[in-house]
Amino acid sequence: MEGPEVTDGDNVLNLTHLGLENLNLELVSENKRKDVQQILLPHNRLVVLPPLVASFIHLHLLDISNNNMVYIGEEILGLTKLKTLLAKNNRLDEFSFPKEMGGMRLEVLNLSGNRFEEIPDQFLQIPTLKSLSLGGNRLKSIPAEIENLISLEFLYLGGNFISSIPSELANLPYLSYLVLCDNRIQSIPPQLAQVHSLRSLSLHNNLLTYLPREILSLVHLHELSLRGNPLVVRFVRDLTYTPPTLLELAGRTIKSHGIPYCPWELPENLLRYLDLASKCPNPKCSGVYFDCCVRQIKFVDFCGKYRLPLMHYLCSPECSSPCGSTSHSESDSEDEVNVAARRMQKVLLG
C-alpha cells in the first residue's frame, strides 16, 4: 500500500473521500510529519484519531468533518500550533474532549452538526478562540462563562433549543457576528446593546415578540435578521400594573420635583435608592421610575420600509398613548426613528 498523499509542497496531507475507517499515520515518514501544516480527513468513516497525530508538531489545521468521530483524545493537546479544528457532522458530544484545553492556541473551532447538549467547560478555557460554531446541535442554554472567550469575534449557535440569551454576552469586546437563528428565544437582554462591535445579528425563526429599545445603540450593526418571529404587539393596558411602593413614591417625588435635600435629612436606604432612578422616555413626561414601570410596545421605522416593535419602559400608565402600539403615537421620537434608519443599513425580515 502506498503512503498517504502529501501535496502542496509537503504542507498538506489530503485524505478526503477515501472511506477510511482507520488512519495509519505510520506510513508518513517522521520528516514529512514535521512539514505537514494541514491534515484533511473529511468524508471518511473515522471514529477516533490515532495517538500518532500528536507527532505533526507544526500542524495548523485539522479537518475531520463528516466522519463518525465519537472521541478526540489528549493527543490533540500535543498540537501546540493548531489554530483551526473543524469537526462538523460527527457524533461528538460534551464528553468527547479532554477535560483541560486551556493551553491550546485554537482560534477557530467548528463543531456544528454534532450531539452537544451543552457547551463544554473546556471550550470556555481557550482565550485565543475567535470563532466558535456549534450550530445544529442540542444545546438548551448558553453558559454565563461564555464571557471568558475574550477574543471571540464569531459565535454560531443556530439550530439548537436555546431559550434565553445570557447578559454575559455583552462582555465580549470583539464579538462581531452572532448567529442565534432557529432556536426558542423569547426575548433579547438589553445588555446586548453594549456589544458595540456587533455587525450582524441573526435571530430569525425564534419566538420573539418585541425587541428592547436599547438595540438602537448598536451603532455598527449592519444586518438584523428577524424573519419567522411572532413579533406580536402586546398592548400595555393588557399588562398588570403593580402600584409603586412607598419607597418608590418618595424617590419619584424628590427626583421629579427637584426637591433639595441634605444626606443627613433622608434615610440611608432612600439615599441609595435615589441613585437608581431611570428617566421616563416619554418626551412629554419629566418623571422618573425605579422598580415599578409600565411596558409599552412602540414601532420604529428601519430603512423607511420595516417597522420593528421595540420595548419601552414608562413611569406610569398615564404616559402610554392609546395609540402607542400603532404606526405612530404622540410619544414617538422622530430622532430615534431617523437614527435607527441610519444605523440599521440592512434589516432582513423576509
UniProtKB/Swiss-Prot annotation:
Keyword Repeat annotated: yes
Ranges for the LRR repeats: 14-34, 35-56, 58-80, 81-102, 105-125, 128-149, 151-173, 174-195, 197-218, 220-240
One Gene Ontology term, aspect cellular component: cytoplasm
Signal peptide limits: none
Keywords: Leucine-rich repeat, Repeat
Cysteine-cysteine disulfides: none
Superkingdom per UniProt: Eukaryota
SMART domains: LRR_TYP (SM00369)
Protein's recorded name: Leucine-rich repeat-containing protein 58
Organism (species): Xenopus laevis
